[in-house]
UniProtKB/Swiss-Prot annotation:
Gene3D superfamilies noted in UniProt: 1.10.520.10, Peroxidase, domain 2
Cross-link (Tryptophyl-tyrosyl-methioninium (Tyr-Met) (with W-98)): Y226-M252
Catalytically driven reaction(s): H2O2 + AH2 = A + 2 H2O; 2 H2O2 = O2 + 2 H2O
PANTHER family: CATALASE-PEROXIDASE, HYDROPEROXIDASE I, BIFUNCTIONAL CATALASE-PEROXIDASE
Complex and partners: Homodimer or homotetramer.
This protein's name: Catalase-peroxidase
Species this protein is from: Dinoroseobacter shibae (strain DSM 16493 / NCIMB 14021 / DFL 12)
Highest rank taxon of the organism: Bacteria
Similarity comment text for this entry: Belongs to the peroxidase family. Peroxidase/catalase subfamily.
Molecular function via GO: catalase activity; heme binding; metal ion binding
Binding residues for heme b: H267
Post-translational note: Formation of the three residue Trp-Tyr-Met cross-link is important for the catalase, but not the peroxidase activity of the enzyme.
Site annotation Transition state stabilizer: residues: R95
Intrachain S-S bonds: none
């Protein structure tokens, strides 16, 4: 073997130049630098699909009933490499769908099933998702058969819905239309825990107070979807666990009744697996050897018998008939006293005291053997917590009410991050409009847009007032769960009309002028707000001697208070907006990091973020008329002055005690401008400076205007799913 033989496993003969690991990335050496990667994580360079592939068009050609039927057949087609419990994969597929959707959190709209992210790290290797890679492999023949028209994101959720239908539940419906991503979602903050399954103490300020958990986190431990099934920090205490159940479900927009229904319905079927001690189980999919092919948690003791399979460590089923939708869960929960025991794997669980043989659970492999049913600490919380108990007692007395409540809650759980019904496809979509879908009526399109623009221009409103109002209306959009945006004009409703970031006095003035104009023209106020912003920008473009029109698409509707779940919008209140150079308070997170987060939710690239900030500054659109970052003496003119100043070495930048900066002339020492770090980052960050230099060039004044208009229009239309349908 010579020195160039790459089979020499004792060391690589050359230092390979590709950065295929994490230890040599710039993030390692400069961890505090602004990392723009979250703006470019799912672009065309990552996707294997053709550039012109449009999933909305592809899904329309899908054989919807055929997919449903094939998944239904798969439920009872047990495979030797992962046999079905009782010959039925229903419980496994339901857990797959539940855990795909259950990572959603209301605070920032991230997580959830809408992208098929369960296929990637970290979710695919969380301990709470153990064995779900087996479920995905079982579904692969279906995905393979239907190809591009069927996304993994849709299939992962459909599987559980079909399973419930197969086992006797009248489901509420199902919508296709989710679009796959092709890599991990690096924008999501899953927590700063020191390790997977670190104590809850690491994400709360007081373990006794579940609500002290850091926002927007919505799980009690890193690596879990909701709460520890054994109890808070692994200590059984149903009363304390109830507090964490209530908090985690509330943070994914579920009320107490929906939470109880999901807990009951989720454990009416299927079983937990604790066939061996956790330390005997192999690595997760991300950490297992290459020959395992992503098949994680290898269990040397698994012999094809359900009793030797290992997933959570708990062992057993919750009901006597785990493949049938019925009221057995509540029957057993209320019929018996329960005591804490341990599974074979050493996990805490609850089992009934003196159970009758007819209530025992048949073995998942050998029906002649019977076992005790089990409950988790979260299940016992349904009995111990007085609010949950009252709800569950009603469910117990009225199984039909339970079934309907659960079916609706399941639909909400699995569709919460899809946005409005304009994103729904297929014959199983329910006709009923639900308030959590943020419904918006269809808006008018036949009015005279040019005439309305003329009236707006004559209204006496300043360009800055109109631009700021349009921006505030649109900036609430979150690509994470397709909520917010200018459509619906909810900026005029509670709670948005009173948000400090929306400058209520200025907002009321602008709305007071625009609403009569909209009514007279037969236009929606939602359209009129955006159109007014466009008018303001076109005024600024003309002042700069340019002639670039701002595109406008009519058709936005106006939502009403009755269509708006005000409480669910409260979490969307911005406490900072780097685009308008505003922060309600000084936070531990820097203004530029908050701006980056907003840009990611809006679906912007780094260049789009830069061009919008530079443009909005010179347009005078800052919150409260602040002068920070307004690097121009031509306010209201759409120029490249911001970028010319930030790249000009005639100035030096001096930090002040209040966290802001002065821009001083190097020769005279005079203060010329003031700024925040959300301004200075465009000169300090190497990537953003490279972009700023492009727009500061003498030959790119027109390009800047065109790019600003394109980015502005992208934000204004971010929620116009009707234009894509």
């Amino acid at each position: 073997m010579d020195g160039n033989d790459l089979r020499n496993v004792t060391g690589c003969p050359v230092m390979h130049g590709g950065n295929t690991g994490m230890n040599t990335s710039p993030v390692r050496w400069w961890p505090n630098a602004l990392n723009l990667d979250i703006l470019h994580q799912h672009g065309a360079r990552v996707s294997p699909m053709d550039p012109d592939y449009d999933h909305r068009e592809a899904v329309k050609a899908l054989d919807f009933q055929g997919v449903w039927d094939d998944v239904d057949k798969l439920l009872t087609d047990s495979q030797d490499w992962w046999p079905a419990d009782w010959g039925h994969y229903g419980g496994l597929f339901i857990r797959l769908s539940w855990h795909a959707a259950g990572s959603y959190r209301l605070g920032d709209g991230r997580g959830g099933a809408g992208t098929g992210n369960l296929r990637f790290e970290p979710l695919n290797s969380w301990p709470d998702n153990a064995s779900l890679e087996k479920a995905r492999r079982l579904l692969w023949p279906v995905k393979k058969k239907y190809g591009n028209a069927l996304s993994w994101a849709d299939l992962l959720v459909l599987a559980g819905t079909v399973a419930y239908s197969n086992m006797g539940l009248k489901t509420f419906g199902f919508a296709f239309g989710r679009k796959d991503i092709w890599g991990p979602e690096i924008d999501i903050n899953w927590g700063s825990d020191s390790e997977i399954l670190a104590p809850t103490d690491e994400r709360v300020t007081d373990v006794a107070d579940a609500n002290s958990m850091a926002n927007p986190l919505a799980a009690s431990h890193m690596g879990l979807i909701y709460v520890n099934p054994e109890g808070v920090n692994g200590t059984p205490d149903p009363a304390q666990t109830a507090k964490y159940v209530r908090m985690t479900f509330a943070r994914m927009a579920m009320n107490d009744e929906e939470t109880a229904a999901l807990t009951v319905g989720g454990h009416t079927v299927g079983k937990a697996h604790g066939g061996t001690m956790a330390d005997k189980v192999g690595a997760d999919p991300a950490g297992c050897p290459v020959h395992m092919q992503g098949f994680g948690w290898e269990n040397p003791g698994f012999d094809g018998n359900a009793n030797t399979a290992h997933t959570s460590g708990l062992e057993g089923a919750w009901t006597s008939n785990p493949t049938q939708w019925d009221n057995g869960y509540l029957e057993l929960l209320f019929k018996y006293d329960w005591e804490v025991t341990k599974s074979r794997a050493g996990a805490f669980q609850w089992e009934p005291v003196n159970i009758a043989e007819e209530d025992m659970v048949p073995d998942a492999t050998d029906p002649s053997i019977k076992h005790n049913p089990i409950m988790t600490d979260a299940d016992m919380a349904m009995k111990v917590d007085p609010i949950y108990r009252e709800i569950c007692e009603r469910f117990h007395k009225d199984p039909d009410y339970l079934a309907d409540t659960f079916a609706r809650a399941w639909f909400k759980l699995t569709h919460r991050d899809m946005g409005p019904k304009a994103n729904y496809y297929g014959p199983f979509v329910p006709q009923e409009d639900l308030i959590w879908q943020d419904p918006i009526p269809e808006g008018p399109t036949g009015y005279d847009v040019d005439a309305l623009k003329a009236k707006i221009a004559e209204s006496g409103l300043s360009a800055a007032e109109m631009i700021a109002t349009a921006w505030d209306s649109a900036r609430t959009f979150r690509g994470s769960d397709m909520r917010g945006g200018a459509n619906g004009a909810r900026i005029r409703l509670v709670p948005q009309k009173d948000w400090a970031g929306n400058e209520p006095e200025r907002l009321a003035k602008v709305l007071g002028i625009l609403e009569p104009l909209a009514a007279a023209a037969g236009a929606s106020i939602a359209d009129t707000i955006v159109l007014a912003g466009n008018v303001g920008i076109e005024m600024a473009i003309k002042a700069a001697g340019q002639d670039v029109p701002v595109p406008f698409a009519p058709g936005r509707g106006d939502a009403t208070d009755a269509m708006t779940d005000a409480e669910s919008f409260e979490v969307m209140e911005p406490f900072a907006d780097g685009f308008r150079n505003w922060s309600k308070e000084r936070y531990s997170v820097s203004p530029e990091e908050l701006m980056l987060d907003r840009a990611q939710l809006l679906g912007l690239t780094a260049a789009e973020m830069a061009v919008l900030v530079g443009g909005l500054r010179v347009l005078g659109a800052n919150h409260g008329g602040s002068a920070h970052g307004v690097f121009t003496d031509r306010v209201g003119t759409l120029t490249t002055d911001f970028f010319q100043t930030i790249t000009d070495m005639a100035y030096k930048w001096v930090p002040l005690d209040d966290g802001t900066y002065e821009i001083r002339d190097r020769k005279s020492g005079d203060t010329v401008y003031t700024a925040t770090s959300a301004d200075l980052v465009f000169g300090s960050n190497s990537q953003l400076r490279a972009i700023a230099e492009v727009y500061a060039q003498d030959d790119n004044e027109t390009k800047f205007v065109r790019d600003f208009v394109a980015a502005w229009t992208k934000v204004m239309n971010a929620d116009r799913f009707d234009l894509l349908a």
